Amino acid sequence: MKILVIVVTFNGLKWLDRCLGSVRASEVPADLYVWDNDSTDGSADWVQGHFPEAKLVRSADNLGFAEANNMGFRYALDKGYDYVYLLNQDAWIEPSTLGTLVAASDAHPDYAVLSPLQMTDGFQALDKQFEKVYAPEGMHFQKRRCATPPKWAPPSYDAEGGTVSGSACPPVTVIRIMAAHWLIPRKALETVGMFDSLFPIYGNDDNWCDRARYHGFKVGIVPEARAVHDRAYRQEPKEKVIYRNYYMGSLVRLCDINRPLWERFLFVCLFTLVKAVKYGSTLPFKHFRALCRMLPQIKDSRLRSAK
């Protein structure tokens, strides 16, 4: 069994020791592939000096998250890896994370993506965005035929301190999951393909999950596995929030091949009005016009995804 952990770096030097070090400490051996997106903080030199075992690629340009990971995908397929694990530069795993996820994937090959619980540093709480995805589908372990552990405890122990068999608990199925921690088996990668170039930064993971479901796969979370996503939550300019939540969210919906394009387009029309009122801004209308101009590319994307 060969696992390739793909890490895309861009000025993330402060996280790299914990990020890459966690892969080195994994109970299940894995190879490291680091694509540096033209960092200016010395990230690439640091990786070369401290993790000589990693396959390090220094890009002359910042290709963005999607295309940089696509380079790693192609490398994994070319070198015959059985699994790829996408790991954000601001994230790290526990020693048991990879082994737990691989065991779950082997037992449930109908999942294209499996994620551990994505938590804050110190394992005090779930990542806020992750919790929005996970909570509606099974925060309570009794729904998964397991004992109920403390809210943030690793579910290898029940409320009385006894062990819980992970094999009795199938993955929690969700619609989408953020790609800070993704285990993808080779078959799923070969079937679903690369990240779509229409989504260089935001939305690529949601689009990939939609395509995976179209091809008959599931997307899931394995609560027996834990990992950290140490992103900072800070106040963002309204323009950036509208771009990410409205524009990229609408683009994901329009490219979702599980629904007819006309249906998605009507939804986005209504979504535009709702967001314009919510944000008190005309920016959603400007972005809507841009989406209309992109309809030929959106149709091409849907055709590619259906192959």
Give residue ranges: language-model regions.
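N-proximal low-complexity "stem/linker" segments adjacent to membrane-targeting elements
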Residues: 1-22
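A short, conserved alpha-helix in the catalytic core of glycosyltransferases
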Residues: 175-193, 198-226
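Acidic/His-rich active-site region of diverse nucleotide-sugar glycosyltransferases
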Residues: 71, 91-192
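Glycine-rich, basic loop-to-helix element that forms the pyrophosphate-binding segment
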Residues: 59-79
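Short beta-strand-to-loop acidic/aromatic patch adjacent to the donor-nucleotide binding site
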Residues: 81-92
